[in-house]
């Protein structure tokens, strides 16, 4: 299932209900259906009003035309024997001749002249008195009734602007259209105008009214019933002809209803696409922000987009040049090849201009194509554009779980990971509460930083509150013991490598913070002296004195105790947490948090409305905000979202899971009492601080800030769809509606806000805990910054980017606004200026206001509008030609190909529809022709029998008048019937020919033929319309009034062609033009035989229907193209997110999260772990600048990433200068995991030889490999990544730390797997920090020329009670044939220097590598009691281990001379040993 798709949870219907699903297009979820109805209403509201005006105009013009120039219906024949009023035929004086042919010809001419001269007389005088009793007053009554109807329509048009119309607009519109359509048919006595009039009314109701399928079907269906009963019972028109006419209208109604349903389904598909795109965008941002900080993501997007825009432009130019070359080769013209040279790189000022440019091919501006590779694909940025920034100062916190190894021994692996997941989830939520950034968690160490990547001056206070909150949470778990350390100083942050993108911090501050945690006491917070200096005015400390810090010497440290300002309340509440019943909060990975997007401030006009009287807040009295000046600056959300200032408590949130009710009440109100009993304090001057939270502190700055931080959901919640976003969309939205409506009324802005708050949802209260003071020049993401006194614009430098003090709108997590890149938008004191520009830039379309008056999808407004505006950046659409002009003709071809494949069945169905109408018109015309000729309406008495005998006896005698008339009319009728039969046969023969054509077209398989289907359909429609007109215009049919049926059929042809055929808009215009030409020629041909008035009426109906279809077809074509682009953006965003997640998490883990698995933990019995470390990293970092250091690491790790990907090894993480990989998990099918890792390690050692530092010093590294069981999984909800736990990880780290430079150190388990294919050297000093493990150095892979001798190698076991060494012989093959004496370093001081050097390397791992080492080597610190004495004991223990190793080396050196039976070393190995000794000394 795709990330953004909403699953269908409807139950399958049975019985007759399943057949009703065709008419029920509603979404299965009530909330989603409400969103759609609201969105549909505000999208089609203008079209509804336009349809009312159009219907009013049509009715008015038709009424005036009928009143001024009424149709002449005195000679109109009616097509049924019961209703035909016969006329006596007055035979003119005609000269009788002996020739029957002459007589027949003269008689026919006399009949024609009689018809033309209207020489009919009433037979019985009841035509006027009986059938049309109201003929005298018909025109007057019709005029009065229709003018009243026009007045009612105008009143209804005004009614559409009221609030009551919005609630039942479908019902009102349905009733109105039905009544108006019925009134249009009343007093209509000319049956020739009824078909065209009915079809036009159907088109207005079904297509142009803007109503959905069911209301349109009800209104038009009611009109059909009215038509049938009115003309059948009131006008008394009945018989076969009336039934056939009704059949034509019924088929036309069915076809129009199919088109109406199709259009609604198309609109619903677009809405679902936009909803999925919106949800996918939100979830993608949340997922990405869980992997990387928001600021880093935005900079990475911006930078990658610039690089890819150039690449895309070059690729498009190349494609166009290749296309031109191919065309020239086909035409035989020789053209010179086009050589595309890349444009010069943009300057420092160029990027901002390029971002604001709209991509058009005319000005050759850069195009950002959503079909191009992901804008967030890793490795798309160059070394010169690394995401690296320096931050000074920041506060770093390390929290270490001390008894983690003890928990692992006492509890099962699943229980330990569950516990760890609960702890880290609680910590992750606390980072949102206190506004700090989680860097990462490594094993049992949790790292937090304040002040970067988002700058804030109170970073130390935030981190201090975070540390106290972490202790309060840990007390609830009972069995977990932690120690916390803090330090303040400068750091460097950036992203390195091509795989497993992660944001790391580098610098001595990180190392010192790790030391503060490792030297702290259990349950205490140890801070350095710089931190104590920053927090001294706000917190109480306990002076610990000077302690010996590993790698730092003596440092003065302090224990953080509690706060000063909130002494009683804070300490009493949080100290009572451990007395409550231990409670582990439930994990709900399917929980989705959409507060940031759903609870919004509003758009630009919302803020502009309050600019005159100052900023407002829905839950703060105006008296408190009266002192706040109105000059503020606004930051726009990169995604166009709205800022969140309200939060509704929901089940499973941070406040419900982490904090008990007492603390929750305190966080909301600042008091232990109920929220109703604790009023907000009044602000008297600018020096006072608005705060009632645990983070309250008096700052010297003369600023006041209202901050709101919201928590982010879990990654699983972002992947698995949840209905919380739909359920929360109904809240907090009336404020936005009223603010939008009162945009221009600045004087009443505050009153409107207060009224809205009193009338709207009561659950949307802003927790007071989210209010904290920070300075004016800082805007934490997700906060509302209200400057109090200073109006001077202040900026904070972030690398090369500056940002102004602003109001953050709708940022995701703590995402900054585009003001970082494009600058903020300022509003003057009078509310004008840039505020108007903001409203112009992002207009309020009021999308999604609910049926019951609530803005149920206000979130969609800015999101969908922003998406609509972004289309011009991705695709350039020519709105006149309705074609894409981006990238030459490539985009247009791609759209056309996909459109044809998607709408193939629809195109064939449209062809069947017009063929069915063509055949139906032939059937109807046949029965009309039988009874519509002049011979059928003239009453002829039967010829007497005497005439028959006299005719047979004497043909030469002259005939009587009646006999001559009978023979003449009988001959005419026989000739006409023969012609009618021939024409009908030709029609149905053509119908069968068309069916054969459709069958042949449907069998087209190759796309090279299918791509011409639109042209084929266009010709098919034109030919069918021409045949229909021609067959009804040949003599004698040109003298018969068949235009009423033909007109309705042609209008249906045009409607199907425009709205259902699936051909291009301009092709439909060509078809329509030919239809109009054919009809007009036919009318001109028939005009000599019929009245001109009826043709004027037909032209009126025809032109009106054509205009309606042109407008609707144009917008449908535009609609389809925009919807296609939305789908491409959705696919692009999904690909980007999945690509990024795949780079950070394994594919199997992503699938598990998609399936709804809440906790991802697995046990693997046999995997191979790889860990490398750079030798002398501390000295190397001291010689290089921070940026040079990060660039060097990026070069190294990018190379390693490519090698790891080549061998299919999974990169776990980079920890400072350590590179951590694993093979064999999570893919259990990798049985050759040890060989993969071994080959990768060998190639890494070869590749790193070509990398040097800036001072041309080669880089050397140590590698450790071990094979064993591990526990792997994902814990936490922020900055998550795939992790490993277990003893095998610790052994691997020890293998690396005890290895030698440029050597691959493997354990015995790995050696047993690889010994048959690789050459090894046994390491005799086999003690690995309290572990008796045989270890080996992997040299290279075996070749065919290498001998495989079986030799006895030495394995050493050392006992702690006896410092001597014992030698044991085991048969192990193959190994390097070297004497032990050559493998032992002779100088004991060299061993000591090597160990010291390794310790320095550990100290130099500047991204918590020391913390990682402390995580893995917990055996040395399990018994710490968190005091200085225990730390000294650790040093003594470490010293004893060194003495044991030295004593063993002495014994080995003494026994060296006794080893006379050792094999001789060859020259190559001797050189290697010599080089190794020299390299060790140099290192």
Curated annotation (Swiss-Prot):
Transmembrane segments: 50-70, 143-163, 168-188, 198-218, 219-239, 242-262, 907-927, 982-1002, 1016-1036, 1040-1060, 1061-1081, 1094-1114
Enzyme class, first EC level, given as a word: lyase
Biased composition, class Polar residues, residue ranges: 355-376, 610-619, 772-786, 1354-1369
Primary subcellular site in the record, as a coarse category: membrane
Known regulation of activity: Activated by guanosine 5'-3-O-(thio)triphosphate (GTPgammaS). Inhibited by calcium.
Reaction catalysed by this enzyme: GTP = 3',5'-cyclic GMP + diphosphate
GO cellular component: cell leading edge; membrane; plasma membrane
Keyword set includes GTP-binding: yes
Enzyme Commission identifier(s): 4.6.1.2
Gene3D superfamilies listed in its UniProt record: Nucleotide cyclase
Subcellular location field: Membrane
Bound cofactor: record note: Binds 2 magnesium ions per subunit.
Biased composition (Acidic residues): 1432-1444
Biased composition (Low complexity): 672-684, 693-712, 720-765, 1405-1416, 1446-1465
Keyword entries, A-Z: cGMP biosynthesis, Chemotaxis, GTP-binding, Lyase, Magnesium, Membrane, Metal-binding, Nucleotide-binding, Repeat, Transmembrane, Transmembrane helix
Superkingdom assignment: Eukaryota
Its biological purpose: Synthesizes cyclic GMP (cGMP) from GTP, after activation by heterotrimeric or monomeric G proteins. Involved in chemotaxis.
Family recorded in the similarity comment: Belongs to the adenylyl cyclase class-4/guanylyl cyclase family.
The protein, known as: Guanylyl cyclase, membrane
Source organism: Dictyostelium discoideum (Social amoeba)
């Amino acid at each position: 299932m795709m990330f953004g798709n909403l699953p269908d949870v409807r139950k399958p219907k049975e019985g007759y209900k399943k057949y009703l699903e065709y008419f029920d297009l509603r979404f299965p979820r009530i909330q989603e259906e409400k969103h759609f109805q609201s969105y549909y209403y505000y999208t089609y509201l203008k079209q509804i009003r336009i349809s009312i005006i159009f219907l009013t105009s049509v009715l008015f013009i038709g009424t005036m035309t009928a009143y001024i120039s009424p149709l002449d219906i005195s000679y109109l024949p009616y097509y049924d024997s019961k209703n035909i009023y016969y006329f006596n035929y007055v035979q003119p004086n005609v000269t009788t001749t002996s020739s029957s042919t002459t007589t027949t010809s003269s008689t026919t001419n006399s009949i024609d002249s009689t018809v033309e001269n209207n020489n009919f007389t009433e037979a019985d005088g009841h035509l006027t008195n009986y059938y049309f009793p109201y003929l005298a007053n018909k025109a007057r009554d019709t005029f009065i009734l229709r003018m009243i109807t026009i007045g009612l329509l105008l009143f209804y048009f005004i009614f559409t602007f009221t609030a009551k119309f919005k609630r039942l607009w479908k019902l009102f519109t349905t009733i109105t259209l039905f009544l108006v359509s019925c009134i249009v048919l009343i007093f209509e006595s000319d049956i020739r105008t009824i078909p065209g009039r009915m079809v036009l009314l159907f088109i207005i109701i079904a297509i142009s009214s803007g109503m959905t399928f069911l209301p349109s079907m009800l209104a038009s269906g009611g009109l059909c019933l009215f038509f049938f009963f009115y003309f059948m019972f009131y006008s008394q028109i009945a018989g076969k002809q009336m039934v056939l006419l009704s059949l034509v209208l019924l088929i036309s109604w069915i076809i129009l209803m199919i088109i109406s349903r199709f259009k609604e389904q198309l609109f619903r598909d677009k809405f679902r696409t936009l909803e999925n795109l919106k949800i996918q965008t939100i979830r993608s941002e949340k997922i990405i922000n869980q992997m990387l900080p928001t600021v880093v993501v935005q900079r990475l997007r911006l930078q990658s987009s610039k690089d890819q825009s150039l690449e895309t432009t070059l690729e498009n130019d190349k494609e166009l040049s290749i296309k031109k070359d191919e065309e020239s080769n086909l035409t035989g013209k020789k053209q010179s090849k086009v050589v595309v040279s890349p444009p010069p790189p943009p300057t420092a000022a160029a990027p901002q201009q390029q971002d604001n440019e709209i991509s058009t091919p005319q000005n050759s501006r850069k195009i950002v194509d959503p079909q191009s590779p992901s804008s967030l694909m890793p490795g798309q940025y160059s070394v010169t554009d690394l995401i690296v920034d320096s931050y000074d100062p920041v506060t770093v916190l390390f929290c270490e779980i001390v008894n983690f190894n003890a928990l692992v021994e006492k509890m099962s692996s699943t229980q330990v990971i569950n516990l760890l997941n609960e702890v880290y989830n609680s910590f992750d939520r606390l980072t949102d509460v206190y506004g700090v950034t989680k860097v990462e968690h490594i094993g049992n160490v949790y790292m937090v930083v304040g002040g970067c990547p988002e700058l804030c001056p109170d970073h130390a206070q935030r981190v201090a509150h975070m540390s106290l909150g972490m202790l309060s949470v840990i007390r609830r778990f009972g069995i977990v013991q932690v120690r916390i350390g803090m330090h303040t100083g400068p750091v460097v942050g950036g992203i390195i490598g091509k795989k497993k993108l992660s944001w790391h911090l580098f610098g001595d501050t990180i190392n010192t913070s790790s030391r503060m945690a490792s030297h702290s006491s259990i349950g205490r917070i140890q801070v350095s002296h710089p931190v104590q200096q920053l927090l001294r005015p706000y917190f109480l400390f306990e002076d610990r004195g000077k302690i010996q810090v590993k790698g730092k010497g003596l440092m003065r440290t302090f224990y953080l105790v509690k706060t000063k300002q909130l002494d009683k309340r804070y300490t009493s509440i949080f100290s009572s947490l451990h007395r409550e019943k231990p409670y582990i909060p439930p994990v709900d990975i399917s929980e989705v948090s959409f507060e940031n997007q759903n609870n919004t401030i509003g758009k630009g006009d919302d803020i502009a409305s309050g600019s005159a009287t100052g900023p407002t807040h829905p839950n703060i009295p105006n008296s408190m905000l009266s002192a706040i000046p109105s000059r503020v600056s606004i930051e726009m959300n990169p995604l166009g979202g709205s800022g969140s200032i309200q939060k509704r408590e929901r089940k499973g949130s941070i406040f419900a899971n982490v904090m008990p009710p007492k603390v929750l009440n305190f966080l909301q109100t600042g008091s232990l009492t109920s929220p109703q009993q604790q009023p907000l304090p009044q602000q008297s001057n600018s020096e006072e601080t608005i705060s009632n939270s645990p983070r309250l502190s008096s700052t010297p700055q003369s600023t006041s800030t209202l901050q709101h931080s919201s928590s982010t959901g879990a990654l699983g919640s972002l992947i698995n769809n949840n209905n919380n976003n739909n359920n929360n969309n109904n809240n907090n939205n009336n404020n936005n509606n009223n603010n939008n409506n009162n945009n221009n009324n600045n004087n009443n802005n505050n009153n409107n806000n207060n009224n809205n708050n009193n009338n709207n949802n009561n659950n949307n209260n802003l927790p007071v805990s989210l209010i904290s003071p920070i300075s004016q020049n800082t805007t934490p993401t997700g906060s509302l910054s209200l400057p109090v006194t200073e109006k001077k614009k202040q900026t904070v430098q972030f690398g090369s980017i500056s940002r102004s003090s602003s109001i953050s709108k709708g940022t995701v997590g703590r995402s900054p606004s585009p003001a970082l890149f494009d600058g903020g938008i300022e509003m003057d004191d009078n509310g004008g200026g840039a505020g108007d520009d903001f409203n112009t830039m992002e207009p309020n379309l009021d999308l999604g206001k609910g049926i019951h008056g609530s803005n149920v999808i206000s979130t969609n407004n800015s999101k969908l509008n922003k998406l609509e505006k972004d289309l011009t950046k991705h695709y350039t659409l020519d709105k006149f030609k309705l074609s894409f002009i981006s990238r030459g003709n490539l985009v247009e071809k791609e759209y056309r190909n996909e459109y044809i494949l998607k709408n193939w069945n629809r195109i064939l169905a449209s062809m069947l529809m017009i063929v069915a109408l063509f055949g139906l018109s032939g059937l109807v015309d046949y029965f009309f022709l039988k009874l519509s000729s002049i011979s059928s309406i003239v009453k002829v008495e039967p010829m007497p029998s005497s005439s028959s005998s006299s005719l047979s006896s004497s043909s030469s005698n002259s005939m009587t008048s009646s006999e001559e008339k009978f023979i003449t009319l009988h001959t005419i009728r026989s000739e006409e019937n023969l012609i009618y039969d021939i024409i009908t046969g030709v029609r149905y023969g053509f119908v069968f020919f068309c069916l054969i054509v459709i069958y042949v077209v449907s069998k087209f398989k190759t796309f090279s033929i299918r791509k011409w289907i639109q042209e084929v359909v266009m010709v098919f429609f034109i030919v069918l319309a021409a045949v229909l007109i021609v067959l009804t215009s040949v003599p004698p049919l040109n003298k018969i009034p068949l235009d009423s049926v033909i007109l309705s059929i042609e209008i249906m042809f045009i409607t199907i062609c425009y709205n259902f055929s699936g051909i291009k808009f301009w092709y439909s215009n060509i078809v329509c033009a030919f239809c109009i030409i054919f009809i007009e020629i036919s009318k001109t041909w028939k005009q000599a035989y019929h009245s001109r008035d009826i043709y004027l009426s037909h032209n009126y109906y025809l032109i009106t229907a054509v205009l309606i279809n042109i407008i609707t077809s144009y917008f449908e074509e535009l609609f389809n193209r925009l919807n296609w682009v939305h789908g491409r953006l959705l696919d692009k965003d999904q690909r980007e997110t999945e690509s990024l997640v795949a780079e950070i998490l394994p594919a199997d883990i992503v699938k598990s999260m998609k399936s709804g698995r809440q906790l991802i933990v697995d046990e693997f019995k046999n995997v191979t772990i790889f860990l490398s470390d750079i030798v002398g990293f501390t000295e190397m970092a001291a010689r290089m600048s921070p940026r040079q250091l990060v660039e060097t690491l990026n070069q190294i790790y990018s190379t390693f990433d490519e090698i790891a990907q080549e061998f299919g090894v999974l990169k776990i993480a980079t920890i400072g200068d350590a590179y951590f990989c694993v093979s064999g998990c999570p893919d259990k099918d990798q049985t050759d995991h040890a060989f993969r890792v071994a080959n990768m390690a060998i190639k890494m050692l070869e590749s790193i030889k070509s990398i040097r530092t800036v001072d041309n010093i080669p880089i050397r590294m140590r590698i450790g490999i071990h094979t064993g069981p591990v526990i792997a999984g994902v814990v936490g909800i922020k900055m998550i990544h795939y992790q490993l736990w277990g003893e095998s990880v610790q052994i691997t780290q020890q293998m690396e730390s005890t290895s030698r430079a440029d050597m691959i150190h493997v354990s015995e388990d790995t050696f047993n797997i690889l010994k048959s294919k690789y050459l090894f050297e046994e390491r005799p000093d086999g003690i690995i920090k309290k572990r008796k493990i045989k270890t080996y150095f992997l040299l290279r892979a075996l070749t065919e020329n290498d001998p495989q001798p079986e030799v006895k190698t030495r394995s050493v076991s050392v006992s702690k009670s006896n410092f001597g060494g014992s030698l044991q012989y085991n048969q192990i093959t193959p190994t390097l044939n070297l004497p032990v004496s050559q493998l032992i370093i002779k100088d004991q001081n060299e061993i000591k220097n090597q160990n010291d050097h390794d310790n320095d390397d550990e100290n130099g791992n500047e991204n918590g590598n020391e913390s990682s080492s402390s995580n893995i080597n917990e055996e040395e610190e399990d018994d710490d009691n968190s005091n200085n004495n225990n730390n000294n004991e650790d040093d003594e223990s470490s010293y004893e281990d060194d003495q044991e190793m030295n004593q063993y080396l002495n014994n080995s050196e003494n026994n060296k001379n006794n080893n006379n039976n050792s094999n001789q070393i060859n020259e190559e190995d001797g050189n290697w040993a010599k080089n190794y000794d020299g390299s060790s000394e140099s290192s």
